[in-house]
A protein has these predicted regions:
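Alpha-helical cap/lid subdomain in secreted, periplasmic
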Residues: 16-26, 42-173
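A short beta-strand-loop structural module common to alpha/beta enzyme folds
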Residues: 26-39
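Single-residue recognition of alpha-helix boundary sites
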Residues: 9-10, 110
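Short, surface-exposed alpha-helical recognition segments that flank or form part
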Residues: 8, 35-38, 72, 151
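Conserved donor sugar-nucleotide recognition element shared by glycan-biosynthetic enzymes
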Residues: 10-13, 39-43
Length: 173
């Protein structure tokens, strides 16, 4: 969602976040390291270099949807997300975890376990959680591209509004 798949560059929620930060006069620079189609494994593989180069104060972890859409083992996704969180904390960064939901293609047990995974990670890692990035978006067909997976540019202000209340205390201190 964060890589602006299928929408014009600069219209996604991360670009809107940078503008909101600027409008609120916070001295914060946003680095969007998202790659469209990325899995937790891919994110973890790139993360050590990124965290060492960028030295972030806050890391937003928004990964896992592609693992779920591919039916990958949730134990692997969970382990990878925990690793990213732990590496972030070791580098001195605060962490915000973004939860997702997936279509019921793999059955209710997998779908329910997928949602529960984010809650478990947030609880055990003691990090704040945005329970569902697409709250207020997922139930509106007009907010989705033809693939019915990726939001249109019109949905991204709502996506930012879902993240902002949890992120604001982390960047305003």
């Amino acid at each position: 969602m964060s890589a602006e798949y299928g929408i014009a560059r600069g219209t996604g929620w991360v670009a809107l976040l940078q503008q909101r930060i600027k409008d609120n006069k916070f001295d914060v620079r946003v680095v969007n390291a998202s790659i469209s189609g990325d899995t937790t494994s891919g994110g973890l593989n790139r993360f050590t270099k990124l965290v060492n180069e960028k030295k972030p104060a806050v890391v937003i972890v928004e990964l896992g949807a592609n693992d779920g859409l591919r039916g990958l083992p949730l134990t692997s996704a969970e382990k990878n997300i925990f690793s990213i969180i732990n590496k972030s904390k070791s580098a001195g960064a605060k962490v915000l975890l973004i939860g997702m939901q997936i279509p019921p293609n793999y059955g209710p047990m997998y779908t329910d376990q997928f949602v529960a995974m984010y809650k478990k990670i947030a609880r055990e890692a003691k990090v704040p959680l945005v329970p569902f990035l697409l709250e207020g978006v997922a139930d509106k067909a007009e907010f989705f591209q033809a693939d019915q997976l990726h939001p249109t540019a019109a949905a991204h202000p709502q996506i930012l509004n879902n993240v902002w209340p949890c992120l604001l205390p982390m960047i305003s201190k």
